[in-house]
Amino acid sequence: MVSFKSSSLFLHSLSALLVLTTLSSAAVNAGFVEMEIDTDEHTQPPKNAAYACVIKSTSCKSTSHFTSDVTYSPALNVTTCHHNGPLRNMWNRVVPWSDGHGMFVNTFYVADVQSDVSRTKADCDVSKLGKKTADDIRDIMDDNINTQTSCNAYIQCYDIKDVDNKCLPVSKDD
């Protein structure tokens, strides 16, 4: 009898949770509820930022996990572009069909410090070989974050011209 009561309670709780999430999803999709929480002022990109990266993680919520807790090699200057407030973070984490797909979402400006070093005229041809792409920056960040933290981060990087003021990619249709 005891196991029957506890499993019955579990099933009722699970059913209530399922109904609640379905109703909340329907309310958001129908436009009755809007989950737009902007907790920080829009920051201007640093002068030398050429890239913007979106980092999603199921375990690391704070931007410091990706800025001050990681030393990037080769040298990258990573600064926060946008971070969601606590309510939006929990929504992204708990609701798998949210924009975050069950993960905390943070965005960052990234400057490649080595590309900013002034070069002599003799270096001009060689400097083109050292120009990194957004995919190169993603690979560097992925290697450094996953070896120095336990964040298990999913990273996407874009050229700075291809993102909005929250460093999220803009669609080509806009």
Swiss-Prot record:
Q: Which residues form the signal peptide?
A: 1-26
UniProt entry keywords in alphabetical sequence = Glycoprotein, Secreted, Signal
- Induction remarks: Expression is highly induced in filaments that grow at the water-air interface when repellent gene rep1 is absent.
Q: Which residues are glycosylated?
A: N77
* UniProt keyword Glycoprotein, yes or no: yes
| Compartments reported by the entry | Secreted
Q: Does the keyword Membrane apply?
A: no
Residues passing through the membrane, by range? none
Q: How does it assemble?
A: Secreted cysteine-rich proteins (SCRPs) are predicted to form amyloids.
What biological function has been recorded for the protein in this entry?
Secreted cysteine-rich protein that might form amyloid strutures which are involved in attachment to hydrophobic surfaces and in formation of hydrophobic aerial hyphae.
User: What is the protein name given in its UniProt record?
Assistant: Secreted cysteine-rich protein UMAG_00792
> Source species, please?
Mycosarcoma maydis (Corn smut fungus)
